[in-house]
Amino acid sequence: MARPALAASLEAVLGDRGNANRVFEILELLAAKEEEDVLCAARTCRRLFAALLRRGELFAGSLPAEEDALRGNYSAEEKYKIWMRHRYNDCVESLSELLGHDSFQVKESSLCTLMKFVELEAECPLVAEQWKGSIAFPRHLLKVVVNGLIPIHEDASLLISRFQEYMEYEDVRYFVMKVVTESIGQVMQKIKERPLPFYQQNVFSLISPINMPNKERDMVKFMMKQDNREEWKVSKLQAHKQAFERMWLTFLKHQLPSGLYKKVLVILHDSILPYMNEPTLMIDFLTVAYGVGGAISLLALNGLFILIHQHNLEYPDFYKKLYSLLDPSIYHVKYRARFFHLADLFLSSSHLPAYLVAAFIKRLSRLALTAPPEALLMVIPFICNLFRRHPACKVLMHRPNGPQDLSEDPYIMEQEEPSESRALESSLWELQSLQNHYHPDVAQAAAILNQSLSEIEDDISGLLELSASELFDKEIKKTSANVPLEFEQVRGLFGKKNDIIAEHFALD
């Protein structure tokens, strides 16, 4: 079994420098076929090089080649440290390859071993500070780890979730963001803007859970311990925001798989925009996302809406783009509830021009003619709320001098520009026709337009996700009253009062 042999090799290498060559016995087992042998070798490497790092027996600084060290003017002590540093690098290379192993246990063990080396190199640096304010953080080693977490041809989400505990360290998180930014630029440039589904999903899995601090005083957990921390660039919240912003902008400037657009847009307002120095730089990504169509276009508009109202973005085509999303499918798609929830938010301002709101009311009404009952029970109160917010649009509810023939309706359904649709000149004959709908609840809801609307808006939150099955269940649970067939209750065949048959016949 490999375990006793590994223990003996470990004890020999740490006990006597004359046994240094036995380190190869440990490194060779990292390439073993048996999973248990590989796991034992990884644990042994962790113990071996952790001890050597703490004892200062690895060469620190710019590492010369092995051949140069043998021929150069180095002491025996320096030659040993240089040689062992090369074996340490061999170990790191083997462990990085094991991050792509078929066994998750091997991947996890390799990841934990490499991150232990990162922690120890942060404690006992093998590189010197490059300039004042910089730190001798093992960035190269961390880059090896990150590149192993974001492979191009396989899903690494499970291993990434195991790595997330290390992202709680401020310095680790900072350098991960820097490394990811570099990786995206290098990888995406090679494939000439084609989507890489596995790679981009892995990158998203790695960066989307990043929990940025809100204040600089909250940044207290560092893997690398330093006394003059206030001089670090890594300890500055502004530096973290810059790295965070650059990372996301680099990731989002490339074409994404369609499913990934939705995932990004869902977390955009909570997890990305609040931590950017210039949130309006997301305008290019949101414009591209709008062009994808469907629910992604809607979520992109939500991002634009946030930029307009919270970050003073000028975007005059916002409502035109929202208006263009209104088509017959909007009452049938599975994201209908989200659409009308956001549309209600977008149209909540009472300062919108009447012609714009009228265009939305009219198009929603026209599309309602072919909508299912469950959608109609939601959209009719939705339209009524728009009337309450914008009383100037109530001319649509009652226009006695309007055209008598529907073909003369001035509203131009095909017009993409709301201001040119002539909606304010029209009337809501569509909703009047719904008063004759086959479903009694729809007919009753549409009849409210014949009355004076109250000032209190209807709460449509409970209607947004109303389904056909819910309507059906509601109907079959109704208890029908007894239907009266006669004014007087019958008491027998000839029991009626003034019954002519009873006067002339008798049953004997």
Curated annotation (Swiss-Prot):
Keyword terms: Membrane, Nucleus, Transmembrane, Transmembrane helix
Main localization (coarse): nucleus
Signal peptide: none
Membrane topology: Multi-pass membrane protein
Spans traversing the lipid bilayer: 288-308, 341-361, 367-387
Any one annotated GO CC term: Noc4p-Nop14p complex
Organism superkingdom: Eukaryota
InterPro entries assigned: ARM-type_fold (IPR016024), CCAAT-binding_factor (IPR005612), Noc4 (IPR027193)
GO BP, sorted A to Z: ribosome biogenesis
Pfam families in alphabetical order: CBF (PF03914)
Subcellular location: Nucleus membrane; Nucleus, Nucleolus
Family, similarity comment: Belongs to the CBF/MAK21 family.
Name listed for the protein in its UniProt record: Nucleolar complex protein 4 homolog
Species, as recorded: Gallus gallus
Lineage, top ranks: Eukaryota, Metazoa, Chordata, Craniata, Vertebrata
